[in-house]
Curated annotation (Swiss-Prot):
UniProt keywords, alphabetically: Electron transport, Iron, Metal-binding, Transport
Family under the similarity heading: Belongs to the rubredoxin family.
GO biological process, one term: alkane catabolic process
Gene3D superfamilies per UniProt: 2.20.28.10
UniProt cofactor note: Binds 1 Fe(3+) ion per subunit.
Keyword Metal-binding: yes
Cited function: Rubredoxin is a small nonheme, iron protein lacking acid-labile sulfide. Its single Fe, chelated to 4 Cys, functions as an electron acceptor and may also stabilize the conformation of the molecule.
Entry keyword annotation includes Metal-binding: yes
Binding, Fe cation: 6, 9, 39, 42
The protein's name: Rubredoxin
Cofactor(s), by name: Fe(3+)
Organism: Thermoanaerobacterium thermosaccharolyticum (strain ATCC 7956 / DSM 571 / NCIMB 9385 / NCA 3814 / NCTC 13789 / WDCM 00135 / 2032) (Clostridium thermosaccharolyticum)
């Protein structure tokens, strides 16, 4: 699965891990995150992430 990086703070969303801080289970692709999901480190939206 593809990882995505926040262009503001450098946080990396790894779909194999998900985002336990926002109840996103492991195996959730970046494209399948809710529209209101934000970076758990700095709070920006999905539009501030790029595929790495």
């Amino acid at each position: 699965m593809e990882k995505w990086q926040c262009t503001v703070c450098g946080y990396i969303y790894d779909p194999e891990v998900g985002d336990p801080t926002q109840n996103i289970p492991p195996g959730t692709k970046f494209e399948d995150l809710p529209d209101d999901w934000v970076c758990p480190d700095c709070g920006v939206g999905k539009d501030q992430f790029e595929k790495i």
